[in-house]
Amino acid sequence: MITLSNGHKFEYMVASGALAFDGKGWFWEKPLVWLGLIKPELFTVVIKTLTRYPRPGNLRWWKPWTCVRLIPGGSVNKIGLTNRGIEWWCHEVGPYLDYEKYPIVGSIYGEEKELVEMAKMLNYFNLVALEINDSCPNTGHEFQKTESAIKSENPK
C-alpha cells in the first residue's frame, strides 16, 4: 500500500494513458469495461498526458492499431502525446468525472511556464496527484526542466 502526502492510499495504479483521458478506457477498451473485464474503479488511474495546446501525436482514431500492439500478457503503444489540449480536458472531460469512484492522477507535459500554468488549471479538479511527464519516448524531445518548474512555484 502506498500513501501519498495528501493521504490518498492505493495499492494498484494504471499507467499514464492506459485508460484514456477519463480513466474509463479508450474506445477499443469500452466493451471490456461494459463486460466487467476491466474495472477502472479498482485502481488509481493516471490519465493520458495533457499538453497546453492540442498535439497530433501518433494516434489516428481511424486506425489505432498502428500505435497499439497486443503482446502476450498486455500491450505496448507509441501513441506519443496525442491530445486535444488541457483547455479541452478542463471543459469537456474534467467536470464530468466521478472523482470519488475513479481516483484520478493528472498528467502534464510541457515547458516550464506551461507546466506551472497547467498545474494551476488542474487545481480546480479533485485529482489525487499530479504527474509531470518529464519525457515521452515517442516524441523525440529531450528531458524537460521539471525540477525548476516545481521550484518556481514552491520556493524553499
What are these regions (language model features)?
Residues 1-103, 109-110:
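N-terminal capping/small domains of soluble enzymes
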